[in-house]
Amino acid sequence: SAASDVYKRQAVNRASKVIYDRSNSAMSQIEPGMLDWKNIFKNAQWFHWTGITPAISKSSADACLEAIKIASDMGITISTDLNYREKLWKYDCDREKIMTELTSYCDIILGNEEDAEKHFGIKPEAIDVNKNGENVKAESFLSVCEQMLNKFPRAKKVITTLRGSISASHNVWSGILFDGKNMFKSKEYQITHIVDRVGGGDSFMAGLIYGLIHFPEDNQMALDYAVAASCLKHTIKGDANLVTIAEVKKLMSGDASGRVVR
């Protein structure tokens, strides 16, 4: 039987370095036709995929496209975290062509400037470098968002996380959402005692999906929920965000400094 995907991480006094061991994993060997997607998606409301799946093998990319097309035919909301991972794209392929086709079916896109550039060649345009850092960041992301929505007309929202690294254990964390008309920005959280930042992006996306389902008419609330949920994840060891809805909402309603209360 095939092994599960494995990544390894060591705690030392330097930046995190992830080592992937996904070759010959079960996911890398999945092929179109192996799963009954119509039955799997029965009563489903949402399907999410990440850029890691098509990166690990051609067959997993083909299976991902199969799932996405069936989900689309069934009227299911589709989201992606573009997740560019250079170490994973090892097989001979046209990465931009693969990711463009997969992303064309998406309603919600999560990614940063690097994801957009590496996957689609999209870069910020006409940015005034004389503006202060925060304004340049927001302006550059707006430029990327507008290009992404032009390239992928089905998409309704483009989202990114903003991480400022003060040190290995102290980060500033926030998020931005653009819906084609308005840009929403969350408050910033000062995370001063990071336990584990691995899984921060996944917990953000999980929180965003929850927020968009439960607050469908309130982009700001959905974004704030996602950022608060992922902020709490930084205080938990491992991938899983072991927090409750009540804990996330409590942090959302906390003081303006956004400091995590332990």
Where do the PLM segments sit?
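Short, small-residue-biased leader/transition segments that mark boundaries at the very start
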Residues: A2-Y7
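Conserved phosphate-binding/catalytic loop of the ribokinase/pfkB sugar-kinase fold
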Residues: K8-K58
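Structural motif
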Residues: I19-D21, W46-H48, S79, L110, ...
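Active-site beta-loop-alpha junctions enriched in small/polar residues
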Residues: S23, I52, N83-K87, E114, ...
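Conserved phosphate/ATP/ADP-binding segment of small-molecule kinases
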Residues: M74, L88-N182
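Short beta-strand/loop segments at the ligand-binding rim of alpha/beta enzyme cores
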Residues: G75-L82
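Conserved post-catalytic alpha-helical subdomain immediately downstream of the catalytic base
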Residues: A168, F184-D255
